[in-house]
C-alpha cells in the first residue's frame, strides 16, 4: 500500500534535531520525526530522591506530556483533570529506563537529571522521538556538568534511540505515522543502544497475531532505522554549540 510522501516500507520519515532550543535548560532539543515534533529538555538538580541519599550515585527521571492542541482535536490538560493518564505514566517511565540504560549513575554524582519531553505536534511516534531527542539533550547537560567541573568523567556509555515498526495489511512498515499506527495489525516500539543492544521491545498484536518470523523481520527493520537515528544524533552533536 502507498505511504504518505511515497515512503518505502523500510524508510524513515525525515528526522531533524535542533540543539539548544530552550534558553534556560542545561540541555534541550527540538526533534522532528516527520510531522511529529517534541521539545526535550534536561535539567540538572543538585539533589537525589530520598531512596538514594548517601548512596554515592545520581539519578535520572523523566516526565512526558502533550500540548492540548498537539492533536487534531484539543485534549484537556492532564493538570486540569487532576491526574496523569496511564499512557502518560507508561511513556515517561519508558523514557527514564531508556536513558538510564546508557548512564553510569555513580559518575553522575549525587544529583538528578530531570528530563522533560513535551509533544507540541503529534503524528505518531511521540514516545520514540522523545527518547531519541532526550538523549541529545542529556548529552548537552552532561557537557555542561563537565565544563563547570562538577563531574570529572563522562557518565554516558553509549547512544540510545527508539523507533516504531508495525504490520499494516500484511506489510511490515518502519516509523509509523498516526494513520498507520491507528490502523496497523501489529505495533512494535524498539529501543536500542548505539552498540545494538536491545533496551526495550514493546509489541502488541492489535487485530491479527504475528509470527516469530514476522517479529524478526520487524526487529531487523527497526535496527536499520535505529542506525540511521544514531547517525542523526552524531551529526547533531557535531554542530557548533
Curated annotation (Swiss-Prot):
It is an enzyme of class 2 (transferase). Keywords: Nucleotidyltransferase, RNA-binding, rRNA processing, Transferase, tRNA processing, tRNA-binding. It holds the Pfam family RNase_PH_C. It catalyses: tRNA(n+1) + phosphate = tRNA(n) + a ribonucleoside 5'-diphosphate. The keyword Ribosomal protein does not apply. It comes from the Bacteria. InterPro entries: ExoRNase_PH_dom1, ExoRNase_PH_dom2, ExoRNase_PH_dom2_sf, PNPase/RNase_PH_dom_sf, Ribosomal_Su5_D2-typ_SF, RNase_PH, RNase_PH_bac-type, RNase_PH_CS. The keyword Nuclease does not apply. Homohexameric ring arranged as a trimer of dimers. PANTHER family: EXOSOME COMPLEX COMPONENT, EXOSOME COMPLEX COMPONENT RRP41. This is Ribonuclease PH. It comes from Nitrosomonas europaea (strain ATCC 19718 / CIP 103999 / KCTC 2705 / NBRC 14298).
Amino acid at each position: 500500500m502507498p505511504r504518505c510522501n511515497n515512503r518505502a516500507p523500510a524508510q524513515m520519515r525525515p528526522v531533524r534535531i535542533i540543539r539548544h532550543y530552550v534558553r534556560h535548560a542545561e540541555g534541550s532539543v527540538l526533534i522532528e520525526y516527520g510531522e511529529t515534533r517534541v521539545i526535550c529538555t534536561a535539567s540538572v538538580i543538585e539533589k537525589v530522591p530520598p531512596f538514594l541519599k548517601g548512596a554515592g550515585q545520581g539519578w535520572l527521571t523523566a516526565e512526558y506530556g502533550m500540548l492540548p492542541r498537539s492533536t487534531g482535536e484539543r485534549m484537556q490538560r492532564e493538570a486540569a483533570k487532576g491526574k496523569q493518564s496511564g499512557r502518560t505514566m507508561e511513556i515517561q517511565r519508558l523514557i527514564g529506563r531508556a536513558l538510564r540504560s546508557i548512564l553510569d549513575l555513580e559518575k553522575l554524582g549525587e544529583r538528578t537529571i530531570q528530563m522533560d519531553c513535551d509533544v507540541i505536534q503529534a503524528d505518531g511516534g511521540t514516545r520514540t522521538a522523545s527518547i531519541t531527542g532526550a538523549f541529545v539533550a542529556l548529552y548537552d547537560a552532561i557537557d555542561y556538568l563537565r565544563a563547570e567541573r562538577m563531574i570529572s568523567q563522562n557518565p554516558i556509555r553509549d547512544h540510545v534511540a527508539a523507533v516504531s515498526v508495525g504490520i499494516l495489511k500484511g506489510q511490515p512498515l518502519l516509523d509509523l505515522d498516526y494513520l498507520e499506527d491507528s490502523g496497523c495489525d501489529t505495533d512494535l516500539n524498539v529501543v536500542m543502544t548505539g552498540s545494538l543492544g536491545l533496551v526495550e521491545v514493546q509489541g502488541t498484536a492489535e487485530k491479527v497475531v504475528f509470527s516469530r518470523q514476522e517479529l524478526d523481520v520487524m526487529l531487523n527493520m527497526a535496527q536499520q532505522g535505529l542506525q540511521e537515528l544514531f547517525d542523526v544524533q552524531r551529526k547533531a552533536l557535531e554542530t557548533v554549540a
